[in-house]
Amino acid sequence: MAQTSAVEKNKRREKLVKRHAVKRARLKAIVMDQGLPLEERFRATIRLAELPRNSAKVRIRNRCEVSGRPRGYYRKLKMSRIALRQLGSLGQIPGVVKSSW
């Protein structure tokens, strides 16, 4: 089980990303637009830098929804390899069967 504080910190980051997503996207579009004057693009860069660091999507860590584990994460299932194995062995994930050959 992951530390509760780490899981909660990641949840706070997700909320911040959601709150600032539109503003951040608008500013990034201005910065990347080569047709705009350099001064306007520079001002947009400064305003982008003033946003909270944790409002960047890059700062979010994929975590297992069962255990909170940050490593060995399967994106499709949103869980770690360990949780997948445990729940798969118990038959709680539809369509997952133990392999044998």
From Swiss-Prot:
Gene Ontology annotations of biological process type: translation
- Function noted in UniProt: Binds 16S rRNA, required for the assembly of 30S particles and may also be responsible for determining the conformation of the 16S rRNA at the A site.
- Its name, as the record gives it, is Small ribosomal subunit protein uS14
Keywords tagged on the record: Ribonucleoprotein, Ribosomal protein, RNA-binding, rRNA-binding
Q: Which HAMAP family match?
A: Ribosomal_uS14_1
InterPro entries associated with the record = Ribosomal_uS14, Ribosomal_uS14_bac/plastid, Ribosomal_uS14_CS
Q: How does it assemble?
A: Part of the 30S ribosomal subunit. Contacts proteins S3 and S10.
SUPFAM superfamilies from the xrefs?
A: Glucocorticoid receptor-like (DNA-binding domain)
Molecular function terms from GO: rRNA binding; structural constituent of ribosome
Q: Which family is this protein grouped under?
A: Belongs to the universal ribosomal protein uS14 family.
Q: Which domain of life is it from?
A: Bacteria
In terms of NCBIfam families, this protein maps to: PRK08881.1
Organism this protein belongs to: Brucella abortus (strain 2308)
Asked whether the keyword Ribonucleoprotein is assigned, the reply is: yes
